[in-house]
Structures are given as structure tokens and as C-alpha cells.
From Swiss-Prot:
Coiled-coil residue windows: none
Assembly mode: Homodimer. Interacts with APOA1BP and CLU. Component of a sperm activating protein complex (SPAP), consisting of APOA1, an immunoglobulin heavy chain, an immunoglobulin light chain and albumin. Interacts with NDRG1. Interacts with SCGB3A2. Interacts with NAXE and YJEFN3.
Lineage: Eukaryota, Metazoa, Chordata, Craniata, Vertebrata
Localization per record: Secreted
Entries under Pfam families matching the protein: Apolipoprotein
Location of the region described as 10 X approximate tandem repeats in the Swiss-Prot/TrEMBL record: 67-264
Protein name in UniProt: Apolipoprotein A-I
Annotated keywords: Cholesterol metabolism, Glycoprotein, HDL, Lipid metabolism, Lipid transport, Lipoprotein, Oxidation, Palmitate, Phosphoprotein, Repeat, Secreted, Signal, Steroid metabolism, Sterol metabolism, Transport
Length: 264
């Protein structure tokens, strides 16, 4: 139905000047628009119906049932098109006769509509005039309030900023003072700690204990390497079958792909 509604909307929005604009012929009459509307409406119903059938057939239930509704719908649409072609002359003759028989009626209706329009137009103009005046009056009343609100908000922000600026500067100054004082208090202890550490390292380097530590470290590393060697060998042996299997799978996939390419 969305397609139908869209088609109807386009038809009425384009109005009687659409064909005149594109085909450069005389503007359509109301009667011609009614006939075109009927034709376009039927085409839209047919197209939208096919869309719904397609959606159903592509659904899980439609695939399971396998009703082949789309083929049947296309056959039905083809049959309907043939019937429309066959009855086209008869239909045109009907529309022509009906249009001829209702000429006087449509003329009277158009005359009545024009008369009603003339009577109603002053009220419409008055309504539009008053509405525009009310909108302008409302705008004039609201504009000063909006300006006052904007100016008030800006003023309050400025006042708040002026009050907070000294406080923020004072806090930054106090924090800087505390950091400087802490650095001053810690400086002697930092120097003492660096001196003690340097002395310990120098004594360790000059004494026999440094060589002892170095020898022990080398011994520990060698022992670790000997202990890790069997574990690394076991790991290598365990990975060999896995790597071989991966290699076989890879080449098998390559051979299969090659065969498929050669057969094409």
C-alpha cells in the first residue's frame, strides 16, 4: 500500500499541469486526471502486490512451502495486461461517453465552486491578515525578553568569572608554594640517598664479593639453560606432528582448488 499511497500523492501534487509541462500540449482536464488516476492506481496495486509476494517467498516459511506464488502472480499479471489491452477501446468509449454526458453537470459544479470561492475568499484573506498581525505582535513582545535573557545570562557568567578568577589564582599560588616547600625539604634526603647508593656500588665493585656475585649469576644461567634444554626439545618434538598436519592440509587445499580451476 505504500507504493499506492505514494503514487496517489504524486498524481495529485503534480496536478493538471504535469502533462502540459512535459509534453507541451494542453493542460489536462479534471476528467482526464480521473481516468489517469484509475490507470495509475491499478498499476500501483499490481506492483505493490508483487512486492509482497516476493517478500513472502523469500521468507523462511515461503521457502519451506515452495508455493511458487511469484510465478503464478506474474502469470496473473500478464493475463490482466492482455485483458486490459483487449478491453481498452471499449473502456475508452465508455469514458468518452460518460464525459460527454456529464459536461453540463461538471460545468455547473465548477460554477458553484467558483461562487463559493468568491464568497469565502474575503474571510480567508482576513484570517491570514490577522494571523500575520498576531505573529508579528508576539515576536515584538518576545524579542525584548529574549534579549534581556541573553544579556542577563552573559552578565551572570561574567560576574561568576570575575569572582572565580581571584580564587583560582590564589589556589594556584598556594599549590605552587606547597610544591616548592616540599622540594626544598626533600632535597637533602635525595642527595644523601644518591651518595649512599653510589658508595655501596663502588664498594661492591672493588671488593671480592662482586666477582663472587658475577660467578654465581653465570652459574645460575648455565643451570637454567641445561634444565630448559630437555623441555625445549620436548616442545619441538610435540610441534612437529602439528606442523606436518598443517602442511598436508594446506597442500591438499591447494590441490583441490587447482583441480576445480582446471575443470572450469
Amino acid at each position: 500500500m505504500k507504493a499506492v499511497v505514494l503514487t496517489v500523492a504524486v498524481l495529485f501534487l503534480t496536478g493538471s499541469q504535469a502533462r502540459h509541462f512535459w509534453q507541451q500540449d494542453e493542460p489536462q482536464s479534471s476528467w482526464d486526471r480521473i481516468k489517469d488516476f484509475a490507470t495509475v492506481y491499478l498499476d500501483a496495486v499490481k506492483d505493490s502486490g508483487r512486492d509482497y509476494v516476493t517478500q513472502f517467498e523469500t521468507s523462511a516459511l515461503g521457502k519451506q512451502l515452495n508455493l511458487k506464488l511469484l510465478d503464478n502472480w506474474d502469470s496473473l499479471s500478464s493475463t490482466v495486461s492482455k485483458v486490459r489491452e483487449q478491453i481498452g477501446p471499449v473502456s475508452q468509449d465508455f469514458w468518452d461517453k460518460l464525459e460527454k454526458d456529464t459536461v453540463s453537470l461538471r460545468q455547473e459544479m465548477n460554477k458553484d465552486l467558483e461562487e463559493v470561492k468568491r464568497k469565502v475568499q474575503p474571510y480567508l484573506d482576513e484570517f491570514q491578515k490577522r494571523w500575520q498581525e498576531d505573529v508579528e505582535r508576539y515576536r515584538q513582545q518576545v524579542e525584548p525578553l529574549s534579549k534581556e535573557l541573553r544579556e542577563g545570562a552573559r552578565q551572570k557568567l561574567l560576574e561568576l568569572h570575575e569572582k572565580l578568577s581571584p580564587l583560582g589564582q590564589e589556589m594556584r599560588d598556594r599549590a605552587r608554594t606547597h610544591v616548592d616547600a616540599l622540594r626544598t625539604h626533600l632535597a637533602p634526603y635525595s642527595d644523601e640517598l644518591r651518595q649512599r647508593l653510589a658508595a655501596r656500588l663502588e664498594a661492591l665493585k672493588e671488593g671480592s664479593s662482586f666477582a663472587e656475585y658475577q660467578a654465581k649469576a653465570t652459574e645460575h644461567l648455565s643451570a637454567l639453560g641445561e634444565k630448559a634444554k630437555p623441555a625445549l626439545e620436548d616442545l619441538r618434538q610435540g610441534l612437529l606432528p602439528v606442523l606436518e598436519s598443517l602442511k598436508l592440509s594446506f597442500w591438499s587445499a591447494v590441490d583441490e582448488a587447482t583441480k576445480k580451476l582446471n575443470t572450469q
